[in-house]
Amino acid sequence: MISENRLSKLRKEKGKYAYSTENRIFAWKNIIWPLLLEVNRPWFTLKEYRTKRDEVSDTNHIPKEKIGKGLISLIFKGLVVKEKENYSIDDNLLPYFKKRIILEYNIAVRETRI
């Protein structure tokens, strides 16, 4: 587990924006996209997200808070859309989901900006 002092030092070294991007990439690559492929639908519930987040957090020894910041950041970026009880992906990403392609973060960002 990374101490708060170490996280603060990382933010200063990399910069605030690089740190946020790192959180988004990690959340997308390790939680959001694999979860969507697992549940086999373009949306997921908060309970499903938390289960996957806890699994990834325990496996990689990363604080849950860091991963949670990644989800929030993905919502602000527009890759993930919050709808009442569920979270879904942007409509422009549906063709990738239907083909069950491993979608990299940079491609997802580019597709949502179109």
Please provide the spans of the model-predicted regions.
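A short, conserved structural fragment
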Residues: 75-85
